[in-house]
């Protein structure tokens, strides 16, 4: 009876969540991190110490933001229909902004690849650069990442159908596959014959794959929080907005990797 009353209570159209300082603090923390990283990469003294501090600061602020959202949705019952629509809209707009960011990276890549300049030797990859074989480690990473998309979809449908154990197992396997993918991406960087400083090819390659790798790490963190909430009985078959947002983000990461593999690895080899 109490459970049913709570469900009916959350169906009203009012927005109960108070204004949050964490989006502003997160923006400031990310600005400090990106500025410190750029200055460090340009050789400015002292910023090599600021970068790890900025990373810790971003993680701390994000942790506080996650804590408030979990408290509002799980313990305070503030995630009404109006709040859930707002959160869904926010996640959707965030992913759209990420799409345009990656679109800029692909634009830079194809701008140089379709019509290589004389400085590049009028060929792609540029003269003197040996691209990574797309049928070796990149193909394995593609299989791993697409498999993680299958396992997280299984976990999602298991949760909807009330199969909590299947949701837990599917999420654990997805996180393990994500860790393996990130490890192999690091191995690929260490064995590569070119660096980010080797012409526009190296810049576009490492910027595109590295930024995607950062998204994989962020998505893994999202799924890890979802796993913890699953284990703590925070999620139900009808109320799992944060978990669902993490899954949507993960599918976005999958799709971006497919475009990277086809264009940067396969076509650009």
UniProtKB/Swiss-Prot annotation:
One of its GO terms (cellular component) is mitochondrial inner membrane. PROSITE patterns: COX3 (PS50253). It comes from the Eukaryota. The keyword Iron-sulfur does not apply. GO terms for biological process: mitochondrial electron transport, cytochrome c to oxygen. It is a multi-pass membrane protein. It is an enzyme of class 7 (translocase). It is found in: Mitochondrion inner membrane. InterPro entries: Cyt_c/ubiquinol_Oxase_su3 (IPR024791), Cyt_c_oxase_su3_dom (IPR033945), Cyt_c_oxidase-like_su3 (IPR000298), Cyt_c_oxidase_su3-like_sf (IPR035973), Cyt_c_oxidase_su3_a-hlx (IPR013833). The chain crosses the membrane at residues 24-44, 46-66, 90-110, 138-160, 167-187, 207-227, 247-267. Keywords: Membrane, Mitochondrion, Mitochondrion inner membrane, Translocase, Transmembrane, Transmembrane helix. It catalyses: 4 Fe(II)-[cytochrome c] + O2 + 8 H(+)(in) = 4 Fe(III)-[cytochrome c] + 2 H2O + 4 H(+)(out). One of its GO terms (molecular function) is cytochrome-c oxidase activity. Its EC number is 7.1.1.9. Component of the cytochrome c oxidase, the last enzyme in the mitochondrial electron transport chain which drives oxidative phosphorylation. The respiratory chain contains 3 multisubunit complexes succinate dehydrogenase (complex II, CII), ubiquinol-cytochrome c oxidoreductase (cytochrome b-c1 complex, complex III, CIII) and cytochrome c oxidase (complex IV, CIV), that cooperate to transfer electrons derived from NADH and succinate to molecular oxygen, creating an electrochemical gradient over the inner membrane that drives transmembrane transport and the ATP synthase. Component of the cytochrome c oxidase (complex IV, CIV), a multisubunit enzyme composed of a catalytic core of 3 subunits and several supernumerary subunits. The complex exists as a monomer or a dimer and forms supercomplexes (SCs) in the inner mitochondrial membrane with ubiquinol-cytochrome c oxidoreductase (cytochrome b-c1 complex, complex III, CIII). Belongs to the cytochrome c oxidase subunit 3 family. This is Cytochrome c oxidase subunit 3. It comes from Emericella nidulans.
């Amino acid at each position: 009876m109490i459970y049913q009353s709570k469900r009916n209570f959350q169906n009203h159209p009012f927005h109960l969540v108070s204004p949050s300082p964490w989006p502003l603090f997160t923006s400031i923390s990310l600005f400090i991190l990106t500025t410190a990283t750029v200055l460090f990469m340009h050789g400015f003294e002292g910023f090599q110490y600021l970068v790890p501090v900025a990373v810790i600061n971003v993680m701390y602020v994000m942790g506080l933001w996650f804590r408030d959202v979990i408290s509002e949705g799980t313990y305070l019952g503030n995630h009404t229909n109006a709040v859930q629509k707002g959160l869904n809209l926010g996640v959707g707009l965030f992913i759209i902004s990420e799409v345009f960011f990656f679109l800029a990276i692909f634009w830079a890549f194809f701008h140089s690849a379709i019509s290589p300049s004389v400085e590049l030797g009028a060929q792609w990859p540029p003269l003197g650069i040996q691209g990574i074989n797309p049928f070796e480690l990149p193909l394995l990473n593609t299989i791993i990442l697409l498999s993680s998309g299958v396992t997280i979809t299984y976990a999602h449908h298991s949760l909807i159908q009330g199969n909590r154990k299947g949701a837990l197992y599917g999420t654990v396997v997805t996180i393990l596959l994500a860790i393996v993918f990130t490890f192999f991406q690091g191995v690929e960087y260490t064995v590569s014959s070119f660096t980010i400083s080797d012409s526009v090819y190296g810049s576009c390659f490492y910027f595109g794959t590295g930024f995607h790798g950062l998204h994989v790490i962020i998505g893994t963190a999202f799924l890890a929080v979802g796993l913890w909430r699953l284990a703590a009985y925070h999620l139900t078959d009808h109320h799992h907005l944060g978990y669902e947002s993490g899954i949507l983000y993960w599918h976005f990461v999958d799709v971006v990797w497919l475009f990277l593999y086809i264009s940067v690895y396969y076509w650009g080899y």
